[in-house]
């Protein structure tokens, strides 16, 4: 059996990072994203400067301001966060299609079969971190391990902006010293019960038989036994029904005008055509679209029903999109909306059985 290679990517204070990127004056100061104190708002996330004062997610904004009177609280901009998340996932898909999103800022990747960097999951994680930093100007932390349980723990090990790797031969020793509170599914109630039994870390858990743990905790006891031995067979479960396929590039030097943008289209279209070819028979291509992000991080996306997917069609779309901003461009993307042929086939099978 092939040894699995799982990466867990977790953006560092994601919402706050996007706000500091888009408003540089906020950087280096205590910042939170959430509702206003006057309206009994709650903190969604905060940067590390705010955390130093004890500010935390899910805390009331009023209490956060008591802890940190200089705290700046900004309203969430979900569209901006979703767009950044989409850009990150576009990077992920250059390495694998086995992606399990946990939230906008967090995902598992199974790179067991990836051919990049001779199959090195560590180098893939390094490259993802580099590209996210260069393209989005935010940082992510990454954990690399043989399973999801350990990869998630590893990503938190050197936060923020860190990478931690647990190789298969390190699993046994690493897990033995883990506090039981680090185990997936162990909350305060279970941790307290384990503590009363004299079980503080995974070494203590290993001293108990699987049967004894099942007697104490029911079916979850078996899960506890497995985790204490570093075992987690849960697969990375991706939503395989894709809405679109796209390719985009962030340029080292801003493209100054439309002509410079148009010069980049053939290379983008060649890459897109290759990705489309790999999906033949699974999806029917629909509307083409272009995405333009200008040098000031404003952006626009334009799609058109009935348009072709040839170079000329993308040139027309790009010209219209560029006209919306008329400024130097830092990122260009092109893509196609998709219709899932597999879903349609499943519907036909369903009706044929009735």
Swiss-Prot record:
Its EC number is 2.7.7.7. The active site is at residue 106. Its cofactor is Mg(2+). It is an enzyme of class 2 (transferase). Mg(2+) binds at residues 10, 105. It catalyses: DNA(n) + a 2'-deoxyribonucleoside 5'-triphosphate = DNA(n+1) + diphosphate. Residues 6-187 form the UmuC domain. Poorly processive, error-prone DNA polymerase involved in untargeted mutagenesis. Copies undamaged DNA at stalled replication forks, which arise in vivo from mismatched or misaligned primer ends. These misaligned primers can be extended by PolIV. Exhibits no 3'-5' exonuclease (proofreading) activity. May be involved in translesional synthesis, in conjunction with the beta clamp from PolIII. Belongs to the DNA polymerase type-Y family. This is DNA polymerase IV.
